[in-house]
A protein has these predicted regions:
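Phosphate-backbone binding interfaces of nucleic-acid-interacting proteins
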Residues: 1-229, 258, 351, 376, ...
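Class II aminoacyl-tRNA synthetase-like tRNA-binding/catalytic domains
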Residues: 122, 315-368, 523-658, 720, ...
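Mobile "lid/hinge" segments at catalytic clefts and subdomain interfaces of large enzymes
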Residues: 128-150, 160, 171, 175-179, ...
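Extended, well-folded interaction surfaces typified by the phenylalanyl-tRNA synthetase beta subunit core
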Residues: 197, 448-616, 836-838, 843-844, ...
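Beta-rich nucleic-acid/ligand-interaction surfaces
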Residues: 43-46, 219-221, 294-296, 490, ...
């Protein structure tokens, strides 16, 4: 999330003297920018400027060359010789760029660097090293560890460098002693990913004077229309999007401006380098740093190309099947036909060479190098959905894509290019072009018809019309009208999230103050149904029972894709045909809504196991989405009038069925090793126990039906899974997951699971109070019945036969033994049951129990079962 530096913020808004980061966080949270963390420095001094008096190379036996240096760190920190004179400190340094005459950053004994690395005098390579000359990485300023920091090359002007004296405080010089505020930005407020946006919000919170930097920059940007005859723009730009996502062309504005005669040896100024590093970015080169700086300051992602390597026209198009790209980070990517690309046209072949994935990351060809003298600045506006999908598809969450997918100001491009050009001129001696190219098909924003009364109706705020108008104007809206309490409001270009009246109500409430919204308790109804519905009560009972069983409730995103289908061995093509596809998925690799909760719950279990959590047992209650390909098409509703009942009914008929399910996954140990005994791993019986607990809690009568192995769904173990039945209604599955599922997800062996359709289960319940069965006072009759039966007959089938034959006199039945062996013969097994008979109105005689026994034996014989002696 964005870092906020008060010194940088001052460029755009008046900040009171002595403003603390704690107070800044309080001011910003008032307008919805939450504090994530205030980062304090991990570095403590003393850290000072040092002057290298001499550096003597000393070859070592291992081939390494170290430098024995004497570094002047000022009288306060220099060593004292035997005569009481101040002399430079002796320091060992292995950096290849160490040289006499340089000014460096010296960490002295007592200093602490990131990672709790303490600097102390130590004997090494035959010398006492009394300090350390530091690199960027060691100070937490960046990733560069190729050598120590040479202040001469660190972006200081000659005058600033000359003023640096041995012993000067480098903590303050490099801003190592300053904290930073990290803020949390919601996805709809992408404009706050810039200092321009944060400064505007600080103005809204405090009333401080704010100056939009884009206004002046936009006025200075050269005109792109009506160029004199014979004068060409910097480069031709063509947008040729033949595969737009949802009909939205991927690029509606592309602004290109050249800067020629750039000095590639120019260094990034110290102030810019410092700001970039504090924002969490590496300083690479002046040209790249300028584009990153403009992005952080204004919010417009930019890219710099080597103009001499590019051949026009630039073509913005979708990728072709089979195209590949190596991005700036050196990784190879197989491109999708949905990827929007920036290409050029070598040898007149239009759009034949890929320069980068638009709005995500550039490719290796055309990048700015240490030899680049002519630069082409790209400042564009891309479709949010297209960029988001590409970034997720290729797993490149770049700073540019984070901004584009949240929405970038579509009028900012000339101003951003102007700012970048000015910086390249000032610090790189370049010459900006006055003939940029501006491909612009941006449409004007649609005005929103807004009733002032909506603020009171929706937010409960008693706000007068003038205040509402002032607030909307202050956030950048153009407000017209006001008669009859209605406004015509045109949102600003940097707020693509403002599209409906409710969005404007939210803005008014946010800036008036959420603390001003009155707290009211809705009155409870005095007539009709009060409290939770029967379904809500049962859902709560299910959740309580599983929690009491020791499972933890979770809530997962309901999105699935090819990887999930593969993990559970599902037929992806067949499943997709009956699944709901999302028009704008959060993740491009999971564009479908789940048909089973277990698929998304498995993602959560997997994440916990990968983070070292053991014995994970989670459950989730939520909806699944069952698409019917034969359902009628969902009609388009009128936008200006209230839909009719018939239209709403047609809309409802086209929606997928959305039953409520509960699913659970149990992994690891059911019982850990201890003084009471050895560990017991989770197995199918633990999942069955969970289902039985649910059944008992809600008063349902659930039975298990073990299907034949070939009929078991692919994700379940063929011999350790059962269908859960409520009478004749199938309501779910329970058992162990298939070994291939455990292997694919990294689950422990024998991991168990269950999933029940609660909507179907609740429908089988009467809703009437559970009637307790009277306890009989007559004695029971207990018998053991052992049957020899074919191995094809399941224990559940035989048990069902016994129950039906015994009738109401049967009180309980338990399978207590399964035996196979040579004594029985091939293809046979023995199933032994303990049964209890009891009558409600009399004592069972021996004749009664014998009659029951005979009915059972006769019924079992129909399955080929014989009673063993």
């Amino acid at each position: 999330m964005p870092m906020v530096d008060i010194d940088w913020l001052k460029d755009h808004v008046e900040v009171p003297e002595g403003l603390t980061y704690e107070q800044l966080a309080k001011d910003l949270v008032k307008v919805g920018l939450e504090e994530e963390e205030i980062h304090t420095s991990q570095v403590t001094g003393p850290i000072v400027v040092g002057y290298v008096v001499d550096a003597t190379p000393e070859p070592q036996k291992n081939g390494k060359i170290i430098n024995w240096c004497h570094v002047d760190v000022g009288d306060e920190y220099n060593e004292t010789d035997e005569n009481g004179n101040k002399v430079p400190r002796g320091i060992i340094c292995g950096a290849p760029n160490m040289a006499a005459g340089e000014k460096v950053v010296v960490t002295l004994p007592g200093a602490v660097l990131p990672g709790d690395f303490k600097i102390e005098p130590r004997k090494t390579y035959g010398h006492i090293s009394n300090g350390m000359c530091a690199s960027e990485r060691e100070l937490g300023l960046g990733d560069n560890h190729d050598g120590i920091i040479l202040l001469r090359k660190y972006g200081f002007t000659p005058e600033e460098y000359e003023k640096l004296q041995p012993g000067d405080d480098a903590m303050h010089l490099l801003h190592l002693d300053q904290p930073l505020l990290e803020i949390n930005i919601t996805p709809d407020r992408g404009y706050a990913f810039s200092y321009r946006g944060v400064a505007r919000e600080y103005h809204h919170s405090t009333g401080a004077v704010y100056t939009d930097p884009a206004t002046a920059l936009g006025k200075k940007a050269p005109v792109t229309q009506g160029l004199p005859e014979g004068v060409k723009s910097d480069i031709e730009v063509i947008v040729d999007d033949k595969n737009p996502i949802h009909g939205v062309v991927g690029c509606d504005r592309y602004y290109a401006r050249a800067v020629r005669g750039f000095d590639p040896a120019s260094h990034t100024p110290n102030w810019m380098r410092r700001r970039l590093i504090r924002a969490g970015m590496r300083s690479i080169s002046l040209a790249v740093d300028v584009t990153n700086y403009v992005m952080l300051d204004l919010g417009q992602p930019m890219h710099a190309y080597d103009l001499d390597k590019i051949e026009g026209p630039i073509v913005v198009r979708r990728a072709n099947e089979g195209e590949k790209l190596t991005t700036l980070d050196g990784k190879d990517h197989d491109l999708s036909v949905e990827d929007l690309l920036i290409t050029d046209s070598p040898n007149g072949e239009r759009g034949s060479r890929v320069l980068g994935i638009a709005g995500v990351m550039g490719g290796l060809y055309g990048e700015v190098t240490a030899e680049t003298k002519n630069i082409l600045l790209e400042s564009a506006h891309f479709d949010q959905v297209s960029i988001a999908r590409s970034a997720r598809r290729h797993k490149i969450p770049s700073e540019a894509s984070r901004r584009f997918e949240r929405g970038v100001d579509d009028q900012l491009q000339p101003a951003a290019a102007q700012m970048a050009a000015e910086l390249l001129v000032k610090y790189g001696n370049g010459e900006p072009s006055e003939h940029p190219t501006d491909y612009n098909t941006v449409c004007n924003r649609r005005p929103i018809l807004f009733k002032a009364s909506e603020v009171a109706r929706v937010a409960g705020l008693d706000t007068d019309m003038n205040t509402i108008s002032d607030i909307l104007t202050d956030i950048g809206c153009t407000v017209a009208g006001g008669g009859n309490g209605e406004f015509s409001v045109t949102p600003p270009s940097w707020r693509p999230d403002l599209n409906e009246p409710c969005d404007l109500v939210e803005e008014v409430a946010r800036l008036v103050g959420y603390d001003e919204i009155p707290v009211t308790v809705p009155p409870a109804p005095v007539e009709g149904k009060v409290g939770l519905t029967a379904e809500q009560l049962r859902k709560r009972q299910v959740a309580d029972e599983l929690a009491e069983y020791g499972m933890v409730e979770t809530l997962s995103y309901p999105f699935v894709g090819d990887e999930d289908y593969k993990n559970f061995a599902l037929d992806a093509d067949a499943t997709k045909k009956v699944s709901v596809e999302i028009a704008n998925p959060l993740a491009g690799d999971r564009p479908f809504l789940r048909r089973d909760i277990i698929l998304t719950l498995a993602q959560t279990v997997q994440r916990n196991l990968r983070r070292g959590v053991e014995n994970v047992s989670l459950y989730e209650i939520g909806h699944v989405y069952l698409w019917d390909p034969n359902a009628p098409a969902i009609p388009a509703l009128p936008g200006a009038v209230k839909p009719t009942d018939e239209q709403l009914a047609a809309l409802d008929a086209g929606l997928p069925d959305q039953p409520m399910h509960v699913a659970g996954i149990l992994t690891g140990n059911a019982v850990d090793s201890g003084w009471m005994g050895d560990r017991r791993a989770v197995d199918w019986s633990d999942a069955v126990e969970a289902v039985q607990r649910i059944s008992d809690r809600i008063g349902a009568k659930l039975t298990l039906d073990q299907p034949k192995a070939e009929d078991v769904p692919a994700q379940w173990h063929p011999g350790r899974a059962a269908r859960v039945m409520a009478g004749d209604t199938f309501v779910g599955m329970v058992g162990e997951l298939h070994p291939h599922v455990n292997e694919a997800l990294g689950f422990p062996a024998h991991s168990a699971a269950f999933e029940l359709n609660l909507t179907a289960l609740f429908a089988t319940l009467s809703g009437k109070p559970v009637q307790a069965k009277p306890i009989s006072t007559f004695p029971p009759v207990k018998q053991d019945l052992a049957f020899t039966v074919s191995t094809d007959v399941t224990a559940a089938e035989l048990e069902k036969t016994i129950v039906e034959a015994a009738g109401n006199s049967l009180e309980s039945i338990d399978l207590f033994d399964v035996y196979t062996g040579d004594q029985l013969g091939e293809g046979l097994k023995s199933l032994a049951y303990a049964v209890t008979f009891r009558a409600e109105d009399k004592t069972l005689t021996s004749e009664d129990s014998e009659a029951i026994r005979k009915r059972i034996v006769d019924a079992a014989a129909k399955l080929g079962a014989q009673l063993r002696a």
